[in-house]
């Protein structure tokens, strides 16, 4: 959801609460739980999963490897569930022409730097830079060039914008901020 008027432009950033992250976390959790149950059933010699008898998988080395993969998968899926629950990467970009200030806010991982808040003066913005990398995995990223600070990404690298969408977004933002567009 974005909100825009003559003087203020607010763009909300999704973060890690995306459908694909939910799907990967569920698939990884269920798959690793299955691996762990098969490894445990081969160790105990009892059927915890009724798909095949536990005698078909001996504990050393197949059961140990499956248990290891199950535990590793549970750690990775718990990491994904934590990033989803903390909503890492979400936030907003606020461009305020009235005050002459740009605010960029993102949620990070818990700790000292949980809240990432950047504030700039609009007169320090040199340009909006559009970086396009072609090939099999093409990516298009929008950057804001700040005097003395370098480039700050405004779009995520995993957002798949079409060339027309990224050009339109860059043109609208450059027009709103009254800065030039650079293509790299």
Curated annotation (Swiss-Prot):
It comes from the Eukaryota. It holds the Pfam family Ycf4. Keywords: Chloroplast, Membrane, Photosynthesis, Plastid, Thylakoid, Transmembrane, Transmembrane helix. Its main location: plastid. It is a multi-pass membrane protein. One of its GO terms (cellular component) is chloroplast thylakoid membrane. The chain crosses the membrane at residues 21-43, 58-80. GO terms for biological process: photosynthesis. InterPro entries: PSI_Ycf4_assembly. It is found in: Plastid, Chloroplast thylakoid membrane. Belongs to the Ycf4 family. Seems to be required for the assembly of the photosystem I complex. This is Photosystem I assembly protein Ycf4. It comes from Calycanthus floridus var. glaucus. The gene is ycf4.
């Amino acid at each position: 959801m974005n909100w825009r008027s003559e003087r203020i432009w607010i763009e909300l950033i999704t973060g890690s609460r995306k459908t694909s992250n939910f799907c990967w976390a569920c698939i990884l959790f269920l798959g690793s739980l299955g691996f762990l149950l098969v490894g445990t059933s081969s160790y105990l010699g009892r059927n915890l999963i009724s798909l095949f008898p536990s005698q078909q998988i001996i504990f050393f080395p197949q059961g140990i490897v499956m248990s290891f993969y199950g535990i590793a998968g549970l750690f990775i899926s718990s990491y994904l569930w934590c990033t989803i629950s903390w909503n890492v990467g979400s936030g907003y970009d606020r461009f305020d022409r009235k005050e002459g200030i740009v605010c960029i806010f993102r949620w990070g991982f818990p700790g000292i730097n949980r809240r990432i808040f950047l504030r700039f003066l609009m007169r320090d913005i040199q340009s909006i830079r559009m970086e396009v990398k072609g090939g099999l995995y093409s990516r298009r990223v929008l950057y804001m060039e700040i005097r003395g600070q370098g480039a700050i990404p405004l779009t995520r690298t995993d957002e798949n914008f079409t060339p027309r969408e990224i050009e339109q977004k860059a043109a609208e933002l450059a027009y709103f901020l009254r800065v030039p567009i650079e293509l790299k």
